[in-house]
């Protein structure tokens, strides 16, 4: 497990059980939070956060699951839950180009991926504000 933090008041929790699980967190800027929980074998989780007040949660159990979250906006929420074998979840969230810092609340995006079973893939890309995405695969 690897955590690289810069900026102010960033918080990261990584809990891993099992064998050959990998978790990587890179946090910059202000008040970003990440929680990664992995159990099983050969799972990979990655969180890359910049911006302000972003929250990422990854929970994986099983074998060979991959979850990647990239957040570069404001007040974004990403939640990836995977159980089983061979799932891939990718969530990318960013503020709109030229976004004005005084409108932080407008940038709020939310993405939730839930994958059960085997070999599911989900990709969500959110740019701007007020976007909501929910993916459930079984």
Segments from the language model and where they lie:
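Low-complexity repeat regions of mature extracellularly deployed or surface/particle-associated proteins
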Residues: 1-138
